[in-house]
Amino acid sequence: LGGSGGYSRIMYEALKQTDSPYVLYMDDDISIEPDSILRALALSRFAKSPMLVGGQMLNLQDRSHLHCMGEVIDHNAFMWTSAPYVEYDHDFAEYPLRDRENSKNLHRRIDVDGNGWWMCMIPRETAEKIGLPMPLFIKWDDWEYALRAAKAGYPTATIPGIAIWHMAWSDKDDAIDWQAYFHLRNRLVVASIHHEGSISGILKSMAKATAKHLLCLEYSTVAIQNEAIRDFLAGPEHVRDLLPTALPKIAAMRKQYPDAVVLPSATELPRTTGEATAYGMNIPTNPITKIRSLGAAVVNNLKPADPRHHEVPQANYPPLQARWFSLGRVDGVTVTTADGRGVVYRQRDRDKMIALAKESAALVKELRARFPEMRETYRSAHADLTSKESWERVFGID
């Protein structure tokens, strides 16, 4: 059932089978101290009025680092981002709380719009009033629920001293792997329900991301994000029906692209020529060098790729060097996955890039034209999608 299906089943059973006053959501790949649960429970009990109590995220592989302190929604691009005054990736080992100069922001109040479901305690009253999560499988179900709860009078607080350890986003490829489909599709679904006004900021951020993916030879990412737009435009019933089939569909699509095929090691391929190694080391640091690098990347992408580099890589890049300014100037390189489990062989294909770009532009144009219609459609279906009855049909409960 994935994230939202699993979380929805938890809430459904908690409401049906127990009289528990709270539902605690946590990821299954975290490390936690029991004190965090006790603190979340204590704060929930003593809150003046019911509220969602969220935990912060510490870096599982660098345990003194506070990876996520508190987040809000950027209502222009409709994307989550760090809340004002938060300290991103704060290292308590180097700057403890008593360090007044470097830790002062950790002592101030941080207001958030929601909290990730790596750890979040939800009052029973909230669930009984606003319903279950949306059938989104993974990504954005937590934010949709927080925004819905806030509208119903149940705010979220992310509390210092309540936290879990979780793998940092920088150690994952979820912005470019199969999860990229759910990131975009569900972002559009939630925006249609909770975003007011123009979507120009959303479309601008989408266009920028697509251009970056194409320059980085991430063709599979663009292909599945195009599919995400199509599935969003197909409507809420279609999105719910996709719960059991979306992941295998996306996995099959990705297999058609070399950038999505993970090889155990770069040694599976011929030794690199090394001619593109320097591109990953020379990071543009000022506007002039950035413009020059962008120009070189665009010019390179307008030319047909040299087929030799689809047989012998020009370089092996670690994730930190696999950026637009390096990948945009090559025809074929291997890139290590963020989690280190292997490499992908990214191969530039001008015709494929142009086809994906045209497809994306046409879909974005349709999205702009039809978004007011989709906004009405998704809002009309919202109550049904989050109802116990809807989820009973998904679960196969008579």
Predicted regions and their residues:
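Conserved donor NDP-sugar-binding/catalytic core segment of glycosyltransferases
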Residues: P34-Y88
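A recurrent flexible, glycine/aromatic-enriched loop bordering the glycosyltransferase active site
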Residues: Y85-M119
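Nucleotide-sugar-dependent glycosyltransferase catalytic core
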Residues: P155, W165-H183, I224
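Active-site nucleotide-sugar/metal-binding loop of Leloir-type enzymes
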Residues: R9-Y22
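A short, glycine-/small-residue-rich helix N-cap motif at loop->alpha-helix starts
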Residues: L1-R9, S31-E33, K139
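Terminal low-complexity segments of carbohydrate-biosynthetic enzymes
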Residues: R185-D398
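Short beta-strand-to-loop acidic/aromatic patch adjacent to the donor-nucleotide binding site
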Residues: S20-S31
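Donor nucleotide-sugar recognition loop
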Residues: D111-M119, R124, E128-L147, G153-I159, ...
